[in-house]
Amino acid sequence: MIKGIQITQAANDNLLNSFWLLDSEKGEARCLCAKGDFVEDQIVAVSELGQIEYRELPVDIAPTVKVEGGQHLNVNVLRRETLEDAVNNPEKYPQLTIRVSGYAVRFNSLTPEQQRDVITRTFTQSL
C-alpha cells in the first residue's frame, strides 16, 4: 500500500517538512520534495530515512493502464484470383507488392509455402 507523508520530526534536519510516498510492500520511499540530501523522485529504502515522525496525507493515485497483447492488421486490396494467378504466372506480376507482418514485400520473392500461407490468411470464409 502506498501512503503520502510529510515528515514532522527527524534526526536529519533536511528531512523536516519534506514530502514522501511510502510503499510499505517494497519498503521504499519516493521523495516528492525535500531540501538538501534528497532530490525529487529519488527512491530510497525507508530505513535510510532513520527515526522519523510524520503525518499522513491523502493520496489519490490513478490506476495504471496496462496494455498487453494487441492486434496487427495488414491491408492488401487484392482479389484471391489475382494472387493465385501470380503463383501460377509470376512473370505477369513482377511488381506485385503485399504487406506481410507490417513490411512491404514482393509477392514473387516469397517461397511457394509463404505464398500459400498469405492467400490462406488473407482470404478466409469467416472471422
Swiss-Prot record:
Single GO MF descriptor: formate C-acetyltransferase activity
Protein name per Swiss-Prot or TrEMBL: Autonomous glycyl radical cofactor
Keyword Magnesium recorded: no
Domain of life: Bacteria
GO-annotated cellular components: cytosol
Species name: Pasteurella multocida (strain Pm70)
PANTHER family according to UniProt: FORMATE ACETYLTRANSFERASE, FORMATE ACETYLTRANSFERASE 1
Function: Acts as a radical domain for damaged PFL and possibly other radical proteins.
HAMAP family: GrcA (MF_00806)
Family matches, as InterPro entries: Auton_GlycylRad_Cofactor, Form_AcTrfase_GR_CS, Gly_radical, Glycyl_radical_cofactor_GrcA
Keyword Transcription regulation recorded: no
